[in-house]
Each structure stands twice: as C-alpha cells, then as structure tokens.
Amino acid sequence: GVLILSGDHLYRMDYMDFVQSHRQRDAGISICCLPIDGSRASDFGLMKIDDTGRVISFSEKPRGADLKEMEEAEKKPYIASMGVYIFKKEILLNLLRWRFPTANDFGSEIIPAAAREINVKAYLFNDYWEDIGTIKSFFEANLALAEQPSKFSFYDASKPMYTSRRNLPPSMISGSKITDSIISHGCFLDKCRVEHSVVGIRSRIGSNVHLKDTVMLGADFYETDMERGDQLAEGKVPIGIGENTSIQNCIIDKNARIGKNVTIANAEGVQEADRASEGFHIRSGITVVLKNSVIADGLVI
C-alpha cells in the first residue's frame, strides 16, 4: 500500500494501526477520519459511512444543502477526513494514470469519485488532530500548546518528537515575568512581560516589552553586540523587539525587526488588510509581521 500524508497537520499517530486496519478489511482506499461538531464541518471533507465502515459518500468542504446532507443525525458528530490516506498501489496508479490524469487534489477530485466504485474504508482516529493550514488555525494551535493542560504535548517520553539539532545555548531571561508561555532555546529576554505566547529560537525581547497572545517565530541567525550597537547608532532597527513595545494577537515571522515604542494591537478590529509595504498583513483579525520586515520606532498598528 501507499501511505499519503499532509504536511500542515499537528497530531501524533502510530501509522501501523492504520495500515493493519487497511489490510484486514481488504480496503482499496482507507481514509483516516475523526468526529467534529457542526461549527467546523464546512472546513473539512465530510463522509457518510455504513455499518461496516465503508465510505458511501464523500464531499470536500461542503456548504449549505450539501452540508445538511452529510450530517449523520441531529445529535451525532460529522465524520471528517483528516487528509491521510492509504491506497492499494495498483488502484492509486490506475486512478492517477487513467481515471484522473489531470487531477491536482485527492480530497476534492479523486476520493469523491472513487468512493462510488471502490471499497473505501474509514479509520476513526480519536486523539488530538489539528489542521494548521490557515493563519488562524496555525495561530490558535500554537497558542494552545502554552495552555495547561495542553491538548497536545511535545513532552511525552514514550512518544518523543524529533526536530533539527541546532546546538543553541539555553535562553537568557533577566528580570522578566513569563506566564503560560513557551520560550525556545537561544533567546534573550530583558525585563519584559510575556503572557500566553510562544517565543521561537534566537528571539530578542527588550526591556519593558509586553507580549500577549503572540507567536514569535524567532530568527535564523544572531547579530553581534557590535552590529546591534552600530544599527542603533545609525537609527536602524536590530532583529528582535525594541524596548517599551506592546504586542498582542500577533504572529511575528522570522528575522523581523520591531523598533522601540511600537504598539501592535489592532485596536480597530480590522479583519483583513494587505500592508506588505509597511511590513505586515492582517488575516482573520490577527496581525502578521512579515519575515525580514522592519517595523519602525513608534509605529501603531
């Protein structure tokens, strides 16, 4: 069989259980799925399944009347596709080469048609899973990691998560107050306040900075003290967040330079804005400071 995964999901799963289920039920295609409530139903591919677990209908991100048709019953959850599939190799090759040679998407093009003629089985996954393919979902999933108890944990010793080795030193935190937050390696925090936020590697946060409900992705490199001093002397902004700055409900991308006395709060509640020339966008009410951008001293967003 061929296992197909998506790259923008957060979950922990033993694929062997999924593979065993696929083999035991002699499925042509198996779809990993999970129950969700009606408020999120139109964001996912939804399935109808029979008593044997066979998928008898599939609709990718349905709305309106199509959404009503996909509801199992008034009090039962929707069954949503996770975008994780196993195909018998010969079935996959036949679908891609002959049936759908121009198709670009499994969920919206291949699976709905295949469900009508191939033995497609649903495999129920009952653990944590989150699609982080949008700005809003990425933001919320990151902040949820800082909550206690967290729905998803990177600290399960029996099921460790592996990432790139960076050989960074521990973070240096001086005179700061940090609550319900995650601070990565190699950071410098000086007399700041960090609430319900995630702070990425090599981040620099200056004195009297207030960070709240913010995902700061950090930096790819360090600037030396001399480089930072020269930039400040020339009126430029070093990487990190300058002193007396307040930021909330924000994603700060890598290598961003945010000056002193900046306020990022979106006080007017703008939902969507494209301000790339000024170094930021607003998506779903969340301010996104762009990678390598410069936010000048004193700017209010």
UniProtKB/Swiss-Prot annotation:
It is found in: Plastid, Chloroplast; Plastid, Amyloplast. One of its GO terms (biological process) is starch biosynthetic process. Insensitive to 3'phosphoglycerate and orthophosphate. Pathway: Glycan biosynthesis; starch biosynthesis. It catalyses: alpha-D-glucose 1-phosphate + ATP + H(+) = ADP-alpha-D-glucose + diphosphate. GO terms for molecular function: ATP binding; glucose-1-phosphate adenylyltransferase activity. Keywords: Allosteric enzyme, Amyloplast, ATP-binding, Chloroplast, Nucleotide-binding, Nucleotidyltransferase, Plastid, Starch biosynthesis, Transferase. Gene3D superfamilies: Hexapeptide repeat proteins, Spore Coat Polysaccharide Biosynthesis Protein SpsA, Chain A. It is an enzyme of class 2 (transferase). Heterotetramer. This protein plays a role in synthesis of starch. It catalyzes the synthesis of the activated glycosyl donor, ADP-glucose from Glc-1-P and ATP. This is Glucose-1-phosphate adenylyltransferase large subunit. The lineage of its organism: Eukaryota, Viridiplantae, Streptophyta, Embryophyta, Tracheophyta.
